[in-house]
Amino acid sequence: MYGGTSVFQGNQTTHGMSDIYPVAQLYWSDRDRNHFMAYVMGGLPQGTYNSNNLANIGIGHGAIDVGGAYTYTNRKTYWEASATAGVTNNFMNNVTQYKSGVDSHLDWAISKGLSRELSVGIAGYVYYQLTADTGSGNTVGANKSRVLGIGPEVGYLFTRGDAQMPMTYLNVRAYKESWAQNRVQGTAVFAVLTLRWGQNNIHTFTPEKSVK
C-alpha cells in the first residue's frame, strides 16, 4: 500500500536462479561461548528477474552490504543464540531506472540441542528501509518499505563413521511475515546446507570435560 492505494495485488510463484553474493568474513572468539564475525558482501544481479513480476528471485541490481554477527553457545546446556545485523547500499536498477534506498536488517535465532545431531528453535528477521527510493523510474514518491518474519527452525548434523565425524549440516527455517509496508508479505521457507571443508567449518556441541 502507498498513499492508501494498492500498488500490487495478487499471488505469484517464481522459480529460477538466485543472485551471486561474494563475501569476505572475519571471525574471532574466546574459543568457548562467545563468537564474533564482521563481513562485507556484494550482490551481483545474475538471478532470475523480470520487472513485470510481483515476485522475483533476483533483485535486478547490484548492492553492497556490511555488518556483523554474534553467537553465544553453551556446550553444557546445548543452548545457542545468534544475531546478525547489517546495512545495505543498493545501486541503480538499469532496467527500471529505479534505485532502492539504504536498508537495514536484523536476523536472529535461538535454538536448543536435543541431541548432538538434532536442534530445534525459533528464528526471525526484521527489514527496515532507512532512506527513500530515488531514480527517474520512481513513480510512487518517497517510498520506504519494511517487514518482519518469525517462525520455527530445525537443524540436523549428518555424521560419518564410528567416530561420528561431522560432514554436513542442514538448517531449515519457516517465517510468517507481518508488519509489511510497500513490500510483499507471505510465508518464506529457507533451507541451508553446509558441507564440510577442512576441520573446523561445522560447529557442533561436544560435552565439556571436567579437569581434575
Predicted regions and their residues:
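Outer-membrane pore/translocation modules
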Residues: 1-101, 141-145, 198
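Outer membrane beta-barrel transmembrane domains
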Residues: 94-212
